[in-house]
Amino acid sequence: GFTGQFSLGHAGFMSIGAYTCALITMRIPTIWGFLLGILAAIILSGIAGLVVGLPTLRLRGDYLAIATLGFAEIIRIIFVNLEITNGAAGLSGIPQFVNWPWMFFFTAGTVLLISNFIKSTHGRACISIREDEIASETMGVATTRYKVTAFIVGSCFAGMAGALYASYFYVVKPDLFGFMKSIDILIILVF
């Protein structure tokens, strides 16, 4: 990401967002229920990002990647064993509210928010942490705070992506958010 942290846990955040939005949308099958589901998905993924980010961002490089991958697998196993998520069978019959115009709207909004963030003072602080963390800390940048904030923002966007995924494909299963989903996200970032 922008702070140079290598995370493989975004499949876990995406699954939190997908299940949250699916459960709310199935109970309230209206556009307002869908929007509430997206908001709840973003908030719950952000809380999970805070819970995971505080202890794991002391790690660096491969160790951070392994710890966040472990988080994603723990979340997947929890969803396999929960009754409310219908276990390994997952949830089906999710009302579809997402189509291409919705996807375009959320993608354009995400690009706009992130590009404005990068150009801001806080975005430049995150980029300086990625380039040289020791120099950033010497210049007075609160590196831990910015790393945790960037991790939370990333988890919120992953939760939103999961919510859109659930509404677009009608089905959410724990197998959809396994190790390979994290690798898919990594491949998309690299290429």
Report the location of each language-model feature.
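Transmembrane alpha-helices and adjacent helix-loop boundaries
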Residues: 1-191
